[in-house]
């Protein structure tokens, strides 16, 4: 376990860049003083932010580059233009070279995934990485993946997601056999596309020792905590994520309006202020910011591009905790024990079922 957690930040990533990244890192540093930062980006912009935060400046090293990946760049464009020179690439490369323990970026998701996959490579048996997040539910927390790394996927890919997600749940939640559900438009076995129905059939047939497959889960089942792990291909998973975050913000706005509408409601708010604060904190989507790229030989955390400093701080916290508690090593050990053999035999089972 490292004495200091070394975090490489893509300081130019996101909708705003350094003016969110640096203040966000400062908030995280206040929570985790045993952190050091490598900051990649425009030195002038970064140092202007650091000037207001001497404690952050004291534990940071700035590496200048004026090449930044735009939010609208296609992954192929980002690789051509920004490979080995962009702030995003350099942050990931620091992890590969052992100069940093984790890279955090709020930049272009497709470009970040392409660069991370190209530079860090995937683990044996994993064809495509996934973005996994931890969501608050009525029953506690659930691991949800894929949140947008890969659009679409066959039954074998969905099974790989189930195995990676269950490995993460075993480590994070201390579960021997996490429950796993496939996100679908209904719970009946006939519902959904061919790929998801094949994945369900495959998971039932294999009856894996490291996870308990419970079948299909509808969208409202995520918030209910219907399973410890919710699996979806990246398109649907990202829509579910954005819908949940939007609903949380909408609810908070409605609540603020209701509590300030009349004198009586304002008085009532004063008496229930503690309860409302707890509810607001629980539903704050910024606290769930920070998706972990699973399936790579290194830790990369993706923050929302449009988040504020507080939200980015939570993404940095995720990276810190992945390193401090050695979660990636533990997840990979679980995959090594169970995942690779399972995925290798899944194709044979799938062929037999067809």
Curated annotation (Swiss-Prot):
Broad class of where this protein is predominantly found: cytoplasm
GO CC entries: cytoplasm
Keyword Lipoprotein: no
Keywords: Cytoplasm, Lipid biosynthesis, Lipid metabolism, Phospholipid biosynthesis, Phospholipid metabolism, Transferase
Record keyword Glycoprotein present: no
Job of this protein: Catalyzes the reversible formation of acyl-phosphate (acyl-PO(4)) from acyl-[acyl-carrier-protein] (acyl-ACP). This enzyme utilizes acyl-ACP as fatty acyl donor, but not acyl-CoA.
Name under which the protein is recorded: Phosphate acyltransferase
Organism: Nitrobacter hamburgensis (strain DSM 10229 / NCIMB 13809 / X14)
Gene symbol of the encoding locus: plsX
């Amino acid at each position: 376990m490292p004495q200091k957690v070394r975090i490489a930040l893509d300081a130019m990533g996101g909708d705003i860049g350094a003016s969110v990244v640096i203040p966000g890192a400062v908030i995280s540093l206040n929570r985790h003083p045993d952190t050091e930062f490598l900051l990649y980006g425009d030195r002038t912009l970064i140092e202007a932010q650091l000037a207001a935060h001497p404690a952050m400046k004291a534990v940071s090293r700035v590496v200048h580059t004026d090449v930044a990946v735009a939010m609208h760049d296609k992954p192929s464009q980002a690789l051509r233009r920004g490979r080995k020179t962009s702030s995003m690439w350099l942050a990931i490369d620091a992890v590969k070279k052992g100069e940093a323990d984790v890279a955090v970026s709020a930049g272009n998701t497709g470009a970040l995934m392409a660069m991370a996959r190209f530079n860090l490579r995937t683990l044996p048996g994993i064809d495509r990485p996934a973005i996994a997040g931890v969501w608050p539910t009525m029953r506690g927390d659930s691991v949800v993946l894929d949140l947008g790394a890969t659009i679409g996927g066959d039954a074998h890919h969905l099974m790989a997601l189930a195995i990676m997600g269950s490995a993460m749940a075993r480590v994070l939640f201390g579960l021997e056999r996490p429950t796993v559900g496939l996100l679908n438009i209904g719970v009946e076995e006939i519902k959904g596309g061919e790929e998801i129905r094949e994945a369900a059939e495959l998971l039932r047939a294999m009856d894996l020792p490291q996870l308990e497959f419970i079948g299909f889960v509808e969208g409202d089942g995520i918030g209910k905590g219907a399973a410890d792990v919710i699996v979806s291909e990246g398109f649907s998973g990202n829509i579910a994520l954005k819908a949940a975050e939007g609903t949380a913000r909408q609810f908070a706005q409605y609540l603020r309006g209701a509590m300030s509408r009349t004198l009586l409601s304002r008085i009532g708010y004063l008496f229930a202020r503690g309860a409302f604060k707890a509810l607001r904190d629980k539903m704050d989507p910024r606290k769930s910011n920070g998706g972990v790229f699973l399936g790579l030989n290194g830790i990369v955390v993706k923050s929302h591009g449009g988040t504020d400093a507080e939200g980015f701080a939570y993404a940095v916290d995720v990276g810190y905790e992945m390193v401090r508690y050695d979660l990636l090593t533990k997840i990979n050990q679980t995959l090594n024990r169970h995942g690779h053999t399972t995925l290798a035999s899944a194709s044979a089972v799938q062929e037999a079922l067809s």
